[in-house]
Amino acid sequence: MVYHCRMQTAWKYEKGVDTMKKQWKIIGALGLSLSLLMSSTALAAHPKGYWPYLSAFNNAKTANNQAQMITTGNKLLQYYQNLPLDSDVASIRYNVNYANYPIYEKQGNYTKAKEALQQVATNGAYLGFHDAVTMANERMRKISPNAQVYALTNTSAPYYGAKHEPKNGTLYGRVWTEQNDSAAQNEAIVSFYIEMGQNAADYERFIAPFEGGDHVIHIAWNFPGEGSTVSAINSGSYDSNIQQTLQYLATIDAPVLLRIGGEMNIWTTATTGDAFKAAYTRIAKQARTICPNVALVFSTNYTSPFGGSMEPYFPDASLVDWVGASLYNNKYQFASSPTKGVDNNEMYFGIGDYADPVKNLSHTADLAKKYNKPIIITEGGSGYLSGYADTTTFAADRIREAYTSLNMVYPQVKAIIHFDRSGSGYDYSLQNNATVQAAYNSALKSNPTLMSSPSQTVTQSFKPLSQVTGANGVVTLRAYCDVIGQTVTVTYSVDGKWVGTQKTVPYNCQLDTSTLTAGNHTLKVVCNAPNGYSQTLNYQLTKAANGSVSFKQA
């Protein structure tokens, strides 16, 4: 029955009909602007002398001469740069930048690509191409490499004072099954699915072995009818069941996190923000009284339908202790049809080359930051397939990044739950794939800020290198840099002397500062990718007479 609950939810990640309709809507809007530009009425409205510039750009575009598209496009934009904005000017700027941003991406010039996309968004908004604006804004978020260097420090991560939040460190664990029971016993947090309307006490025989304080227990309280269940809750139909469930949760001898109706932003049977907030509030207010041992979790899917948002569903912040997300990073949209999809589709929904755990969590991180809440990954993973479309390596790489980089880039991530189950589509179970299991184990071992027990004391956290002072001896450096579809190489050097090169996440480097003389030194970190992307991060490393070192980004 718990299996049925999960598989029902998993189907949503494969559902693509609505997504494709939205994508075609974008393509239609983009084509419309070009047809308007080419009409005789529009041509007559353009300023005198424009035609040689426009003709040169159109000829380059027709020939797919990308070098000439950039050159002639820039000349055309320069001709129009000082003209007041109207539909003709906006159409020129929109079309040139829309045609050329993919060329900049291909060259690894993401600064110019984002500048072009910003013009797509600005001029698209003027022209009323709202879907194109949505696409451009999300693409700017997804293509940015966000290169940054971090250091492992003896300082604490941000602490929000939320119920059952570790002051430092990140709890890790998995969704429980009979098959993974022994592994779950050795981790800090364990998750169980319960559906609205069920007798929660029936799960006591599974939950009881994890009581006693050695584990945090996460309850994913799902709404089986999705939006229709929300309506029933608001009508009072589930009041008795809600009270019984909360009374049971009050008896659990362990810290409890309760996810109330997760993933509401992608439900097939949709609900409104106001309706969901009313249902959440109806449950949460009772929970505050009946089971004060329970922390309340508001948890969405990591991405919303095209043009959608998590924000409309967020209830009163006083009724939310943690902000959560379901975070799945898969190679293909459909496990049943493992083929590459439309690029903008995969970009928007974080699939394939865009399935980066850090970037896919960015919308959730923005929401949590706004309301000063810790983050929990309430379920997630990277599924693997076998046979001709084997995605084992892809899945292992994403698992490795999730457990080495998520709480480095987002130190407010205080819990991660792996969806350790198999199904008819993607398989997320660790025990069924030795390569994925090894990546999971290796990542856990390499990250000293991950907690195998809620009682574990974590004394370290990752900080952006530019914020590090008072370090000494060997300093552990790591980097984050995601270049779409590329293998990144990170090279470290001090005063021109090579220190290390890494090609796998988290690009670890052990910098022995004891070998440096007192005074100022230059640490250079270079991120390269085969498509031509290159970014150099320079830091002034200052070593004091007592041996302590500090870093300042140049």
Predicted regions and their residues:
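Substrate-binding cleft of extracellular glycoside hydrolase catalytic domains
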Residues: 197-299
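Glycoside hydrolase catalytic-domain groove-lining segments
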Residues: 203-220, 328-386
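N-terminal substrate-binding region of glycoside hydrolase catalytic domains
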Residues: 61, 80, 84, 145-237, ...
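Aromatic-lined carbohydrate-recognition surfaces of secreted/lumenal glycan-active proteins
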Residues: 288-309, 372-385, 418-421
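Long, low-complexity serine/threonine/glycine- and acidic-rich segments characteristic of extracellular
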Residues: 458-548
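Sec-dependent signal peptide cleavage junction
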Residues: 38-48
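Aromatic- and acid-rich polysaccharide-binding/catalytic face
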Residues: 185-194, 311-353, 419-420
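Substrate-binding cleft of secreted/luminal carbohydrate-active enzymes
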Residues: 128, 149-151, 256, 374-458
